From Swiss-Prot:
Source species taxonomy: Bacteria, Bacillati, Bacillota, Bacilli, Lactobacillales
Family, similarity comment: Belongs to the universal ribosomal protein uL3 family.
Stretches the record annotates as Disordered: 116-148
Keywords of this entry: Ribonucleoprotein, Ribosomal protein, RNA-binding, rRNA-binding
Entry protein name: Large ribosomal subunit protein uL3
Its job: One of the primary rRNA binding proteins, it binds directly near the 3'-end of the 23S rRNA, where it nucleates assembly of the 50S subunit.
Self-association state and partner proteins as the record states: Part of the 50S ribosomal subunit. Forms a cluster with proteins L14 and L19.
Stored Pfam families: Ribosomal_L3
A GO term for molecular function: rRNA binding
Species this chain originates from: Streptococcus agalactiae serotype V (strain ATCC BAA-611 / 2603 V/R)
Cellular component GO terms, alphabetical: cytosolic large ribosomal subunit
Annotated GO biological process: translation
Length: 208
């Protein structure tokens, strides 16, 4: 069965194992998520569990949103997402970090940091041209394509806005779970800025 939870990225730190091994970890705070709706094939066409995370003031919610969360007897939520392949939950139930344990392999999804308008070298990793005085080609994108089409093809790698994309990093290991603080420590780095929304769920391609 799939495990999943929504949380916020706190930042990075480091821990040491009993043998003295140094491990860089990302700290993710995941307060209990509330199940707002259980979707079924009969009513919705597919099976999923809708969860809410991070309370917000009622004045910021409209009537439909208030009525939706009232069924779960909880406050309006800032973030609402769905998880599939999670069974045995009812509306109003809570998902906490206690469902995970050290050694679990998970996929982590977040929104990458925005870098603004960037050139092809930083955005796509292209090589630069010669930097000597005789060269007229330094950091430009280069050839736009052959003469025959008389146009630039779609998806040509050019300069543009970089970052701000949905990114999933697969097969990360949970190093430690601290239930009393609603904190999960994940080995390595995860996408997103501090305080950004992070989705943690069981790895799809984990080795069995």
């Amino acid at each position: 069965m799939t495990k999943g939870i929504l949380g916020k990225k706190v930042g990075m730190t480091q821990i040491f194992t009993e043998s003295g091994e140094f491990i860089p970890v990302t700290v993710i705070e995941a307060t209990p998520n509330v199940v707002l709706q259980v979707k079924t094939v009969e009513t919705d066409g597919y099976e999923a569990v809708q969860v809410g995370f991070d309370d917000k003031r009622e004045v910021l919610s409209n009537k439909p949103a208030k009525g939706h969360v009232a069924k779960a007897n909880t406050a309006p939520k800032r973030f609402i997402r769905e998880f599939k392949n999670i069974e045995g939950l009812e509306v109003g139930a809570e998902l906490s970090v206690e469902q995970f344990e050290a050694g679990d392999v998970v996929d982590v999804t977040g929104t990458s940091k925005g870098k603004g308008f960037q050139g092809v070298i930083k955005r796509h990793g292209q090589s630069r041209g010669p930097m000597a005085h005789g060269s007229r080609y330094h950091r430009r994108p280069g050839s736009m394509g052959p003469v025959a089409p008389n146009r630039v093809f779609k998806n040509k790698r050019l300069a543009g806005r970089m970052g701000g994309n949905r990114v999933t990093v697969q097969n990360l290991e949970i190093v430690q779970v601290i239930p009393e603080k609603n904190v999960v420590l994940i080995k390595g780095n995860v996408p997103g800025a501090k305080k950004s929304l992070i989705t943690i769920k069981s790895a799809v391609k984990a080795a069995k």
